[in-house]
A protein has these predicted regions:
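Structural/interface elements that position substrates and couple domains in central-metabolism enzymes
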Residues: 1-425
Length: 425
């Protein structure tokens, strides 16, 4: 069995999850940060992180961390942590391709006594049913005899400077009791607030996938309530503030549900449920409702424009924000694109402005070229879609100055007071 003294870690995948983890471990023990994209490796070697999760100063502090896109550099590692994406495909089914590819790569350098820990969000059973067989097949080694595994789900919240990897409690697990204890010890090297050792890998997998599923369902409920209250002419935020005076009322808000976690992970759980003969109803209903919010937003906007006698066809709308959440450059699975596409269906021209987002990435992912400068008096409607600090600082007067003399200001994020906008969710 490995010892902490002999530990040499490889972190596979240096994105929003992998890099902060690699940096923290790199302050304590030897670490190789591995990514298949040489451009990412070059960027990190130059001391920069375009995701903005880790500062140049923090990168410098990780004195034992090196970066590589070459598998050969992983041969000396004995503790592998997999932090690759687990997306869904066009049919909203789990796409384990990145996980299988990562497992294949690790299998090529796996040795007797090594431990492989997965952090990527999956359905219960995926580690042992999909990943382990790949490791066995490629390496020729036998699971739980020659090598071992663990699962420790990531809980990174992109853009959150308060909840960082070191101060978020970590779930750990292992394929044997001894390995579970060792995995737990390894993570305790960097997790300052402690760990929770789950009773099995499947329990740890299930815990992760329901964290985001629970949040998704709760937001769906509030979204449905917002639709109901809008029909009744009641301000949803006023209702939620009043209800929030009760100590056990959960403080969710309506909105678009995007990103790489909340809008994706429930499909992993529903896929597994359906494979064992159970059709989940509440989870899928919540997904349908949340996925329909972009269209709902545009419908409400068009109605407001008509009431104000603003010509809809040929109108020009400014969408403030493209990233899936505030103060973050991440545009993966952003639902702002649903608003843009729906506006296009009405022959409305949509400009998107987001100072956080890389323009080349926006063009590559969505075919959108964000505007660089904001011009006053240009728009028939302004949609405040993401609550970036820059937009909050502008205030209602500056936001309205972007509109024509007759325009709609739609506040999706409750940034402004009710009286300062024409519409809000």
């Amino acid at each position: 069995m490995l010892s902490i003294a002999d530990l040499k870690i490889a972190v596979i995948g240096l994105g929003y999850v992998g890099l902060p983890l690699a940096v923290e471990f790199g302050k304590k023990v030897p670490v190789v940060g591995f990514d298949i994209y040489q451009k990412r490796i070059d960027e990190l070697k130059s001391g920069q992180d375009h995701t903005l999760e880790v500062s140049p100063e923090e990168l410098k502090q990780a004195s034992q961390l090196s970066y590589s896109a070459n598998l050969e550099d992983l041969k000396s590692c004995n503790f592998f942590i997999v932090t690759v994406p687990t997306p869904i495909d066009e049919f909203k089914q789990p796409d384990l391709t990145p996980l299988v590819k990562a497992s294949t790569s690790i299998g090529q350098v796996l040795k007797k006594g090594d431990v492989v820990v997965y952090e990527s969000t999956v359905y219960p059973g995926a580690t042992e049913e999909t990943c382990i067989p790949v490791l066995e097949q490629v390496s020729g080694l036998k699971f739980n005899q020659d090598f071992f595994a663990g699962y420790s789900p990531e809980r990174i919240n992109p853009g959150d400077k308060l909840h960082r990897v070191t101060n978020i409690l970590k779930i750990t697990s292992g394929s044997t009791p001894e390995v579970a204890e060792f995995v737990d010890q390894v993570y305790n090297l960097v997790i300052e607030v402690g760990t929770h050792k789950a009773t099995s890998i499947k329990v740890a997998e299930a815990a992760k996938v329901i964290e985001n599923t629970q949040r998704d369902v709760n937001i769906a409920l509030i979204n449905e309530l917002a639709v109901i209250f809008n029909k009744m002419g009641i301000d949803t935020e006023a209702v939620l503030q009043a209800a929030g005076t009760k100590w056990n009322f959960l403080p969710f808000r309506p909105g678009l549900v995007g990103g790489h976690c909340i809008g994706v992970d429930p499909y992993y759980l529903t896929h597994k449920a359906q494979s064992i003969g159970y059709h989940p109803e509440i989870i899928l209903a919540g997904r349908r409702l949340n996925d329909g919010m972009g269209a709902y937003v545009v419908t409400q906007l068009v109605k407001a424009m008509i009431k104000k006698k603003i010509q809809v066809e040929g109108a020009k709308v400014l969408v403030l924000g493209l990233s899936f959440k505030e103060n973050c450059p991440d545009i993966r699975n952003t639902k702002i694109i649903d608003i843009v596409n729906e506006l296009t269906e009405y022959n409305i021209a949509a400009d998107v402005y987001d100072p956080w987002v890389d323009a080349n990435e926006a063009q590559h992912e969505y075919g959108i070229t964000p505007v660089v400068n904001l011009e006053q008096g240009q728009y028939d409607a302004v949609i405040l879609a993401v609550a970036h600090d820059q937009f909050k600082a502008m205030g209602a007067e500056a936001l309205r100055a972007l509109g024509k003399s007759a325009h709609i200001l739609y506040d999706l994020k409750y940034v402004l007071d009710q009286s300062e906008s024409d519409l809000r969710l």
